[in-house]
Amino acid sequence: MAPLTEARTWGMTMFDQLLCRISFKELRYLGEFTPPATKWSLVTPSAMGGQNWGSASYDPVNRRLFLNDIRLPNVRRLLTRAEYDELIKTEAPTPDGHNLAPMAKTPYAIHSKSYISQLGVPCAQPPFGTISAIDLDSRKIVWQVPAGTAEQLGPLGMKLGLPLTPGMPTYAGSSTTAGGLVFYAATQDYYLRAYDAETGEEIWKYPLPVG
């Protein structure tokens, strides 16, 4: 994943993109694996994972690994324990990645949240998650496709119902069959999908009651 730059910040409109660019310039960012500090720091890939969050599936005949990833940056800062004790009274963890946690055997706590705009969408360019096939002999990506649509998501928590394909964060691994299919269900639009293991083409999908 390429390093994030001011030019590569993103927004659904020119206005939230501008705000993301402004916030990028205010953040501390030293590139990949930026360590936390008392100043808000940008981390990408985030602690939510890159290609190491979910599991993977393997085709032993063609020696291909099918792997999904998460491409969401987050921001974090170190707090003293006194700051943490005060902040935890009013700020609880939330599903969008906002988190407060003490760091064992240190005088610090970590305060982290997703790097998102005022509209609640990521400040990084899509895709936000992909599924890839990797040739283990050449160590090259054979194909890579966005993971899912934004049907169940949208700005300010609204469900747009639009089959846009920005590629969403993924939370589990795939299953591969000897018949040349890769099944995947851990997208945020609640579908079970079957991909062609050779090309990555989506050849079937079925809606699920939950995701």
Where are these regions (language model features)?
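Beta-sheet-rich non-transmembrane sensory/scaffold domains
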Residues: M1-G211
